[in-house]
Amino acid sequence: MLDDKYKDRSIAVHIVLAVIIILFIGRLAQLQLYEDYTGVAEDNAFYRKPIYAPRGLIYDRNGKLLVYNQPTYDLMVTMKELRDLSKAGTPIDTMELCGLLGITHQQFCDRMAYIKDRRKNYGYSQLTPQRFMTQLSPEDYAMLQEHLRKFPGFTIQNRTLRNYNYPCGAHVLGSIGEVSKRQIERDSYYRLGDYAGSDGLELTYEKELRGENGEEILLRDSRGRIQGRYKDGSQDRMPTAGIDITTTLDVDLQMIAEELLHGKIGSIVAIEPATGEILAMASNPTWNPSLLVGRLRSEYYPILQNDSTKPFLNRATGGLYSPGSTFKTLQALVCLEQGGITPHTKFACSGPNTKPIKCTHHHGSPVSLEEAIQESCNPFFWLTYKTTLERDGYGEGNEKFKANYRRWREDILSFGLGFKWTDSDVFGLKDGAIYRAETYDKIYGKRGWKSLTIRSNSIGQGEVLVTPIQLANAAAVIANNGYYITPHLNKCDSLLDNRHEANVSRKHYDVVQEGMWRVCEYGTAHYYKLPNLAVCGKTGTTDNSHGKPHSIFFGYAPRENPKIAIAVVIENAGFGSQFACPIAMLCIEQYLYREITQEALFNRMKNLVLNSSVKTY
C-alpha cells in the first residue's frame, strides 16, 4: 500500500513537470515565431536607406588639402519590384537600359545573377535595394536621371569617393575599399557595400575618418514599393561627418622625393628630429593614388598586384636592408659608451690588404675615430667591435663575451632598430633584425661563435637588417644627442611624451657628429655638399646577393639645431656616394630652402633610370 502511494505521487510529479516543460517550450516557440514574424513584417514595411557620412579630409602640415571627397552614385535595383512587373506583363526594357549604361545584355544578366547568388551577395533580400552598378560619374548620373522613370525598381544612391589633389603619397595615405564579410562580422557598424580604409592613414584612422552614417526610414506598400518617409522623417538619423586629419607630411617635399625615385627601386624617409614628425615617406615603385578609386580600382589593382617590382610593398616601412657603413656611426657610439674605445683611439689600416676585413681604399694610418667615419674605414670599426666584445674575455662560449654582446645588442636596439614601434601610427612597420646571442647559439652551437664569426656586423652587414624609416630615426637620435620621439604622421596628436632615450651618454655624440660632418665636407659625400649649410651624414654601400649593391645615405641638417633627418635607400644602384647621397642633399635643400637651386643635378637624378622594370602608374 505504501509503495503504491509513493508510486502515485511520483507519477503526479512527472505529469506536472511534463506540463511545465510543454508550456515552456510552447511559450518559447510563440515568442520566437512572433519575433520572427514581427521582424519580417517590419522588414516588409520599412526600408532603412543609409545616408553616408562624408569622410574626413586629409591635409599636409602646411594646410594643403591632400585627400577630399567627390560625389558618386550607385545604381540600385529592388528585385521584388522587377518580379512584380514581370508578373504583371510589363517588364522593363532591359536592352534600352543596357544601352544607357554601356553594357551588353549578357553583362546585365551576369550582374542580376550575382545579386541573387546568396553565396556571393550574402546580404541579399528581394525587398532591399541591391547594388547593380557602383560609382557612376556625375555625367552618368545626370543622363540616368532623365530616363530613370522608364525603369521602375531602379533607384540612385548618393555617396562619396576619395579624390586627390596631388599624384603622390599612395603608400602613406592609403586607400579605401568595400568592406568584406569578415569586417562586417567583426564590426557591427558596417553594412554590405560600405567602404573602409584598406591601408595607410585611411586604415589607421578609419574610425576617426569614417564619421557616423545616418539613415532615412522609408515606408513600403504590400508590393515593396517605396511610399514615402516614415513619420515625415522625424525618426530619420542624420550622418555625422568624419574628423579631418592634418598630417606631418610636407607635400612639396613628398613630391620631390617621389620624382627623384623615378626609374629606381628604393625609398626616402625624412623626419623632423625634435618632434618625430615624418616630413616625407616615399617608396618606389608607386602609383597615382587616384588609380585605386572608383571603377579604375578593379582595373589597376590586379595590375599593381602582379607587377614583379612589387609596388604595393612600402619599402620605407617594410623593406629590410643591411645598413652598411651608415651603421658605423651607431657602432662608434655604442662602443664609446661601453668603453671598447675612447674618442682618442687609433687603429692601423693597411687598405685593401687588411685582414680579416679589408678597407675599400688606402688612406692615412693609424686612423682616428673622426677620420675612420670620414674615410669609412672598415678595419677600424671591426677592431672597435672586436675590442668592445672581447674586453672581458675571449673565445668561443666565453660567457663574459656573450654578456658583452647582449649589452651591445641592447644598446643598438635603443636607437630604435630591431623592433617595430608600438606607439606609432605608421602603417606596415617591420621589425628589422639584430640577432640575439641565443640565435647565434642555435646557428653555430653554444661554443661555436665569437666576434670573428660575426665580424660582418661591425660594418652593418651580416645579420643586421633595418628599414629606411628606422635608419632615418637613427639619424634623428644622433641629431638630438641621444633621444628620439616615435615617428608619426598625425600632426594633431602630440606624441612628445613618447620620448625614448638611447643608451649612450650625451658626451659621446660630439666626436661622431664631427666625423659625419667631415663625410659631407671632405669625405665620400663632399662632391654634393650644399653651400653655406653644415650637413652631417654617412654614405653606405651594402652587399646584395641578387645584383649590384644598394646605395644608402643617412644624415641630418643643419648641424646645429637640426630641422631634418633623412635616410635614402636606392636598390641595386652601387656606391652610396653616387646616388643616395645626391638625392638626400636635394631633399634637404628643398625642405630647408623651399627650392632646389641645383637644377642640373635635380634633372639628372630625376631622369636617371636604374631599373628598366619600374613602371610609372
For the regions a protein language model found, what residue spans apply to each?
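Beta-lactam-recognizing serine transpeptidase/beta-lactamase-like catalytic domain environment
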Residues: V67, D221-I226, Y230-D236, A274-T326, ...
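Periplasmic/cell-envelope proteins involved in peptidoglycan metabolism and beta-lactam response
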Residues: M1-S298, L320, N404-S414, S545, ...
